[in-house]
């Protein structure tokens, strides 16, 4: 009787032992899947970008000045942006910048919203982007005004939270509240004419770091 009981228990336990031998780490699989998913879905990034803005033209009041040999408009900007990937194709965020435009010289500190869209599934690192914002601060040599960007970019991630960012686009910037004066050489008097706004159009070349 005892021999028959032992034989029955051995036969009943064999399928369970065989199942564990085939897949000994089955209980660990869900944890591994979660870890892999979290690694792939790192959705939040900080981007620090430098841009050189090659000025094409500028309008002040009713006068428009194009780029030429003696009037070489330029500019440098440093932008810090927080981006979040809502989907595999769409990202949005917000940022703040410190911009210096030259010839004529203007300083501005814009706060802006940033949007990216990745239309190519075969090249997920490539995207189109647009930014829209406003320069909040205004004082001597610092001007408020609207700003906007539109262009293409490429973000190459070397690690989970470190990569390179490249952008090429169009930059539109308004400088509001520019004081205008008229000088009369015959009398030596200067007359205040009021305040005007300048609008500059530029090609923007950008390089940055992604964290």
Predicted region positions:
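Cleavable N-terminal export/targeting peptides
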Residues: 1-40
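Outer-membrane beta-barrel "beta-signal"
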Residues: 197-211
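Transmembrane beta-strand segments of Gram-negative outer membrane beta-barrel proteins
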Residues: 37-58
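Outer-membrane beta-barrel and related beta-rich outer-membrane complex signature
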Residues: 60-62, 106, 176-180
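Extracytoplasmic loops and strand-loop junctions of Gram-negative outer membrane beta-barrel proteins
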Residues: 30, 61-66, 133-136, 186-192
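Gram-negative (and chloroplast) outer-membrane scaffold detector with strong preference
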Residues: 50-56, 76-151, 156-164, 209
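Flexible, surface-exposed loop regions and adjacent strand-edge segments
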Residues: 63-67, 110, 145-149, 181-189
